[in-house]
UniProtKB/Swiss-Prot annotation:
PROSITE patterns: GATASE_TYPE_1. Composed of two chains; the small (or glutamine) chain promotes the hydrolysis of glutamine to ammonia, which is used by the large (or ammonia) chain to synthesize carbamoyl phosphate. Tetramer of heterodimers (alpha,beta)4. It comes from Vibrio cholerae serotype O1 (strain ATCC 39315 / El Tor Inaba N16961). This is Carbamoyl phosphate synthase small chain. It comes from the Bacteria. The lineage of its organism: Bacteria, Pseudomonadati, Pseudomonadota, Gammaproteobacteria, Vibrionales. SMART domains: CPSase_sm_chain (SM01097). Disulfide bonds: none annotated. Pathway: Amino-acid biosynthesis; L-arginine biosynthesis; carbamoyl phosphate from bicarbonate: step 1/1; Pyrimidine metabolism; UMP biosynthesis via de novo pathway; (S)-dihydroorotate from bicarbonate: step 1/3.
Amino acid sequence: MSKSALLVLEDGTVFRGVSIGADGISVGEVVFNTSMTGYQEILTDPSYSQQIVTLTYPHIGNTGTNSEDEESTAIHAQGLVIRDLPLIASNFRSEQSLSDYLKSQNIVGIADIDTRKLTRILREKGAQNGCIMAGDNLDEALALAKAKEFPGLKGMDLAKVVSTKEAYAWKQGSWTLEGGLPEAKADSELPYHVVAYDFGAKRNILRMLVDRGCRLTVVPAQTSAEDVLALNPDGVFLSNGPGDPEPCTYAIEATRVFLEKNIPVFGICLGHQILALASGAKTVKMKFGHHGANHPVKDLDRGVVMITSQNHGFAADEATLPDNLRATHKSLFDGSLQGIHRTDKPAFSFQGHPEASPGPHDAAPLFDHFIELIKQFRA
């Protein structure tokens, strides 16, 4: 028999439904994601640390879960909110139902609530703190108190929390339908050595770099510039990640060193914001952020529109860009800055997720541009 669950927002709004995960209490910033597929990749994206994810598509869990689609070693979202959980997970790759997957990692979840109403609240009032309570003895007053106690993501440095604790090599390319996940490539197939800062890196980002000939050394978020330079990299990659970029002073300072050395730098998501801060721009907390796989972004250089995958609650402030930074991409939803390029250094970044997972690959050529900068650096 299904257990009950409730979601309480900091403004006092209460949603009652059924539990689809573990028993317990979870608190975080409640956000909504408009992706129709890719729920497992979303849950395991470290960028969702300290966030409760609401999926707007009504049927979630149809294809179950499997070990190959995880973007990290664990679920990083604080909780999951959906409209309907199908009774049967049907897919030839399925290994476990979504409900069992949540329970196995002690993640709370709630279903059978009005996710359209919840999304409208978040869109109109902005992202709110919330509390999911699942199991017996549900207490609305306690849930509301816990939601109000949560400090919010502003000023929170989560990159160093979710980052790897030890450096490691990554040489595995992308999954294919015919062969699944491939074996690690030989060094002879990977001519470019790239150091990737792990602020919460998704595996598919690393795979797409390997696809383009990069031998990766993935390092912890707080690795010094001196330690990275000792590895003699051909380029430095700044990964995605959760939380506020401004407290990540260690990463901002290291990036400034790489810029001074004219080493190619490519940033995604949090890495984009780190490059902006290192170059003298400022960042802002967004009202409800961008979370989804259907966001139109205009490439200002080529004059074309890309459909992109997005997941961020902070953004670089275009009004603060110094003269040596030019805007390269803008959101067609709200006009926010989506990409920048240094005019005096081989460095650029993109706010969205060109690796998708889930989502379209319209922005994948950004990886190719990074390789072009590396080739010029090595020439």
